[in-house]
């Protein structure tokens, strides 16, 4: 078909047996170019076969006419079936080694085996690579298969499944694999998942031709700078930075493969195969004690993280029996830590949903989603109809819970403390986070802070320094308390008690704040207040110095105070414009 021998290894050539993945390509009669991933057929290399077949959409299934259907043929068909390939053709090879009756018998057997699978209607073409018989017919069948196959999805979230990595002297690290989901361009920055290493694409090739942009679905070789070969392995994913969220726990529906001869129990030891990756896996059933032919919802814990997307298909093999036992579809690549009693209902909704519905479902499940999470979990940047708040997408329910919690806390605080300006910002944020947690929604501290800030910006609550209050609230100081406070400060001047000392003396913080707001006291520093009359005395002293100016030390001496008060007092006058500073001297405004 291609004129290319995909067997690279010396052992493969010596034994006439495919051991590792091989690659070839050709131009079809229609002019379309197609790439092949040659996967091992021997039963000992099924794991390698899975790493190559995972990302592909179309299958050329090979059965030798002289050897007939084999156990590995059955397992390969089961794998192809559960992966849901979008088209296929069957090559009945070695036609030259059998007579016509044997060829017809082999074809009937193959057709019977394909019944009820995704390849049930695939054309079967008898052919021989030795004589050339049927090769043109096989090429035409492949061309027809490609022409009717659905166009590959092309979004803006590329994902290249790495199935080979090597180094070239003078060029650096090269990764090859099947590209899906979006385009990659030479020169752009990329990330290798799940490890997180960043690199830059030096150059791209497909079918040994240099290209500037690679499109899905195609075989791509990416020459990378900034990352060494030892940092990459088969099963990794090459994508754009931040586009993917590696996971070691997923929720899915799995179904036993056709013809499984024993019950499928979650208690076995399994290997999980998706894309080009393989992981050990543990399975937990949600809605049944065993897995029936109709399948079951499951939670799968992987031995280490990998990159998975909603609707990705995967294969499960039972380690002890060394056989493929099930296939599945990823429904949630990043499920809640605690599934809860509604897990089945949630997964049923996800199973019915299209890809475009996933962002809204994610928001409904979590109540709030970070913008960065939305991109890496769904591939979308927006949630139609949802509200965006400081880097978060939030649901109406979360907005309502948070607003009610803030208003209830402030109302109770104002009722209990009428003289108080308000409640501490941190206290309101904690109340919002606690309310979200009790309601089963996300209770991230950053989310609570963002919502509280948004409530302030929207006018639902008001801010005064480090305090929050309802817009209608006005602090009410007990009659006579303000006069008693100002008298205490005046009596202590020129070295009055600090704010901390006043509070220890029985004056409420709210009373002191009220005095400052009303102008009964002047705050010259966070812990120092003075009477307006004392401040005006200082201004008069500076004014008396006229054009000669006056030092802080002279002001301190004339006031009879200490540097503890004189320095912040003069800095306060500078800030308010009553004085100006030139070197060590102060001058009254206008002099």
What spans do the regions from the language model cover?
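Alpha-helical scaffold elements adjacent to nucleotide-binding pockets in ATP/GTP-utilizing enzyme cores
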Residues: 48, 72-79, 105-113, 137-145
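C-terminal effector modules of nucleic-acid-centric enzymes and ribosome-associated factors
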Residues: 97-103, 109-112, 124, 227-523, ...
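Conserved nucleotide-binding/hydrolysis micro-motifs of P-loop NTPases
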Residues: 42-43, 65-70, 85, 94-99, ...
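Conserved catalytic-core segments of large NTP-driven translation/proteostasis enzymes
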Residues: 95, 101, 112-260
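Residue-level signature of catalytic and energy-coupling elements of molecular machines
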Residues: 1, 16, 38, 49, ...
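P-loop NTPase switch module centered on the Walker A-proximal segment
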Residues: 1-47, 56-63
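Conserved Switch II/interswitch segment of TRAFAC-class P-loop GTPases
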Residues: 32-34, 39-44, 53-105
